[in-house]
Amino acid sequence: MPHSHGLDPNDPSGRRAFLGKLAATAAAGAAGLTLTSALDPEVLSAATIGAAPDAEHWLDNLKAKHKQLVDAYEPNDGWPLGFSHTFLATQSAAAPGNSVIVLRHFAMPLALDHSLWARYKIGEAFKVTDPATKQPAVKNPFYKPAKGVLLADDMSIDRLIARGAFIGACNIALNVLSGMLASNAGVSKEAAAKEWTAGIIPGITILPSGTWGVNRAQEKGCTYCTGGG
């Protein structure tokens, strides 16, 4: 039965839980985040959501017999990418599969290119460790990493895209999280949102929301796999 895990920032109860978790992160002192930096009602307004990108044709080429969605709502040390890789790797040559990854909630920054990670202190804020340095990541550790850094080279975002994986990033999380970290880069929330939008890795589609993407993938016949975390 189709289902989903994690917090949904788009319904009222899910929104409260989502912002509550942001507050908990702030209380822990992650990169100086504060609750007030997260509470921007405009981000979750109907007007903002309604102006989100049109991605209805995102999955038009999702035509394999075997299709799986990985719902990534936490970075979880890159395991959502690993799940996509193992699903693709275990299909037969006669019946290859399609993999869909939705990067939403706190996993959304995995969709950003290297240039934004140090500038916004993303690794420090969301406790993403670079497996090469064992320190908070100052670049996206899952995008074009050196050979042998990841558990499997083919789980990197660039290689998954090259293998035909469909990857989408939540526009709601993009706006919420860029606003939270805007002060790290010394810019306004509006400027941060524009920079994050421009910094999406080529081949990744910005979705109206992550839950929208989870829904569309399942409507297209994908089985569901949680990204964990």
Model-inferred region functions:
Residues 78-94:
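Histidine-anchored nucleotide/phosphate-binding helix
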Residues 65, 95-99, 162-168, 220-223:
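Loop/turn elements at helix/coil->beta-strand transitions in domains of secreted/extracellular proteins
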Residues 182-229:
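Glycine-rich, aromatic-bearing surface loops/beta-hairpins
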Residues 1-14:
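N-terminal secretory signal peptides
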Residues 96-117:
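Acidic helix-start/capping segments at beta-turn-to-alpha-helix junctions
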Residues 75-77, 105-110, 167, 172-177, ...:
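Solvent-exposed loop/turn segments at secondary-structure junctions
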Residues 121-147:
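A glycine-rich helix N-cap at a beta->alpha junction
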Residues 11, 33-66:
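C-terminal segment of N-terminal export signals and the immediately downstream linker at the start
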